[in-house]
Amino acid sequence: MKKVEFLPIKTEIEMPNGLQWHDKKLYVIDQKTDNIFILNEKGKKLDEFSTLCENGSGITIGDNFIWLASNGETEARPFRGSDTHISWILKLDMNSRNLISRFPTPDGGGVHGLEWDNGLLWVTAFNPTALILVNPDNFEVQFKFEIDQSPHGLAIEGEGIWCSDRVDRNIIKYNKSNGKILEKIEIPDDGPDPHGLSIKDKILWYSDAAFPNPMRPFPEIGSIELR
């Protein structure tokens, strides 16, 4: 088990729940506003735009689309006319930023993490707890494996996939072909609440939305140094 240090950057985002590195920019879905923020490596805001997401959780980018985990009824902001209070996976055009389509979750339950993987899409599931790989064109399940985690953020690293867990406060790397555990990071008591995950230059990044039931009274985005 590796020792870990969390290296935060400054952020003005109130509830950064999911994050994804893409083209040297960090895309973050804010659970408070359901807006997407685009940041540089130091956390400076480059852009911000609204979405039709509700209770935004995971975010990933693939095939020139932004994919969002819209995790059902929001508790972080007032309801909007566009809210359905149902969990969906949203598909947004990268250029227009408009909603192109939406898909039910593979297990019919809530959804936290998403991760693009060579033309396919990983999705977290809770009925039972599992990681599910789907075809993003029709959401047919290609592969899945059950896990002993309450899954949240996801990040692909080679033949492995990292998954964070807010309940047991750990981040586990699985072999994405068979579900075997490869590495495990235990988060210290004074560490962040691991919502989102992404990876850049072989370095893991995390986000802590500080909602609901926060471990600490402030949000955080940063990188993870393993020793």
Model feature map: region roles:
Residues H195-R227:
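Blade-level signature of beta-propeller repeat domains, shared across WD40, Kelch, NHL, RCC1
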Residues N40-K44, D93-R97, N135-F139, N175-G179, ...:
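Short loop/turn segments that connect beta-strands within beta-propeller blades
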